[in-house]
């Protein structure tokens, strides 16, 4: 046994390393990475051609495939960005929001990060404004309350303790406040804003909203008691 161990120890380090790379579980070699990048760029060019030809559906598919299969390709971030834009233009709001979200999660160092974040925030705020107006008018909304809140939470998570996050958190409180049966959630949302960003421009109004909700709840309680007394 000892002679065998000695013989193994005498093998050159390069031979051992080469042997260890013989399985499929090893890291991707530089040549493979370059080949994948080249393939990704070729796919991106096909997506651009479809885009320029007005074949929106095909362009969306190819842009998404480029960014998903070849995330390290030079144009992968641009592919995801353009996919999101086309989805938004096509009216597929939830899909567009998700594509923007994938961009923000994958390419935080991109020069277009702030542009994408602002676009995503605008989409979430627009969805929320429609939800609030519909709640007061008694209409049904296209997106559920849960989905709209989730959109705003994602926006806030990409820019914690920023003005964008403050606006998003305040809007979450407004959404819940517009629902008569969501007062606890509204209070919690407004309080979270005040606790995490007490110096934000939205904090004073959030604190005021908490007091207002408590007053409205007390008035409703008194009215209910009065109705019981009259019964």
Regions found by a protein language model. Name each.
Residues 8-17:
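Bacterial N-terminal signal peptides
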Residues 1-9:
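Bacterial N-terminal signal peptides that target proteins for export
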